[in-house]
């Protein structure tokens, strides 16, 4: 087994076939062989999608590999379990434990364990990352492995907040980063918000983004998804995962994407609903100091803007005196030419007139 092993955990009702979803796409992009360099766990409540005669070899292979968690022995792979595993998976997260057992079985089958395990997951898949980390920490053979976790909107679902292995990070987690969607309003989609009390050891980083529960995990559907995909690619590569054709974005690119988000903010704010709102509403109270401000989306957006347009940033922060007007006007002209969406967004919110 290599020095770094990567584990991907799909969200509820999603599996390796959903290549437009970032977790499945990460598995597709990761260099090496499945179960040697990386592995993917299908999400609770998911099932293999039928593919037609015109399907590509990749589509047929993914369909054959996709299994509903809870219907196979996690070690032998032999068919077992409840015919209601799919429904139970959607409702309660049934199958997450099977994914933990399967991951541990893959690791224990190797002679040489990795030094580092990187994980990424969405929704209950992110919670599965927590559970795997706890399982690794409790096993003497795997306890010393360093763990890094990227979570997309970690949501355990009702009835699961009382289990510490689903809402806390153990001591073996070195780095934890999460995308948290600030406009999800369904009460049953309450996220796990790791704080210093629950994670005194690891380095943590949070990206609070507009949109609903799934907004950040579909890279081709919106700008938030593309930004989030870039961020998870960068996180995994930093900690040793090798990716084919990783997404690269410059600070200017990020400013332009965030600017488009600002222009379309009203649409993002509508995306956190659906029929399940009938089960209860709850606004997410997140520590995003930029959430109710007029322009910046989050601290990541502000930092990219400050690096890319330092003169304009200084003017926004301190104002512009007469002596600095020529430099400011020159910087503004450059911004308009090189980052037109950013310029437009500043006009739209009334910062520029």
Task: Cite the ranges covered by each PLM segment.
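Active-site- or binding-pocket-proximal scaffold segments within functional domains
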Residues: 1-353
């Amino acid at each position: 087994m290599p020095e770094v092993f990567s584990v991907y955990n799909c969200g509820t009702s999603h599996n390796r076939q959903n290549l437009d979803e970032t977790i499945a796409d990460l598995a597709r992009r990761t260099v090496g062989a499945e179960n040697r360099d990386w592995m993917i766990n299908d999400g609770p409540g998911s099932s293999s999608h039928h593919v037609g005669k015109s399907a590509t070899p990749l589509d047929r292979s993914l369909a054959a590999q996709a299994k509903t968690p809870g219907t196979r022995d996690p070690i032998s792979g032999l068919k077992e379990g409840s015919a209601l595993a799919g429904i139970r998976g959607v409702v309660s997260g049934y199958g997450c434990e099977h994914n933990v057992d399967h991951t541990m079985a893959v690791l224990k089958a190797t002679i040489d364990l990795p030094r580092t395990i990187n994980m990424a997951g969405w929704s209950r898949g992110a919670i599965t990352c927590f559970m795997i980390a706890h399982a690794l920490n409790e096993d003497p053979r795997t306890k010393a492995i360093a763990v890094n976790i990227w979570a997309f909107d970690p949501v355990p679902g009702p009835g699961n907040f009382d289990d510490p292995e689903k809402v806390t990070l153990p001591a073996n987690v070195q780095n934890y980063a999460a995308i948290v969607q600030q406009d999800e309003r369904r009460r049953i989609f309450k996220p796990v918000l790791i704080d210093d009390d629950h994670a005194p050891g690891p380095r943590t980083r949070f990206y609070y983004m507009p949109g609903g529960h799934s907004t950040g995990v579909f890279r081709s559907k919106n700008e938030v998804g593309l930004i989030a995909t870039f961020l998870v690619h960068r996180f995994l590569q930093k900690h040793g995962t090798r990716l084919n054709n990783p997404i690269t974005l410059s600070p200017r690119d990020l400013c332009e994407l965030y600017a488009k988000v600002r222009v379309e903010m009203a649409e993002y704010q509508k995306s956190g609903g659906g029929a399940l709102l009938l089960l209860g509403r709850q606004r997410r109270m997140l520590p995003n100091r930029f959430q109710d401000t007029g322009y910046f989306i989050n601290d990541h957006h502000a930092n990219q803007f400050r690096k890319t347009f330092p003169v304009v940033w200084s003017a926004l922060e301190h104002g512009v005196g007469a002596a600095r007007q020529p430099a400011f006007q020159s910087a503004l002209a450059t911004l308009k030419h090189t980052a037109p969406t950013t310029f437009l967004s500043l006009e739209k919110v009334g910062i520029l007139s």
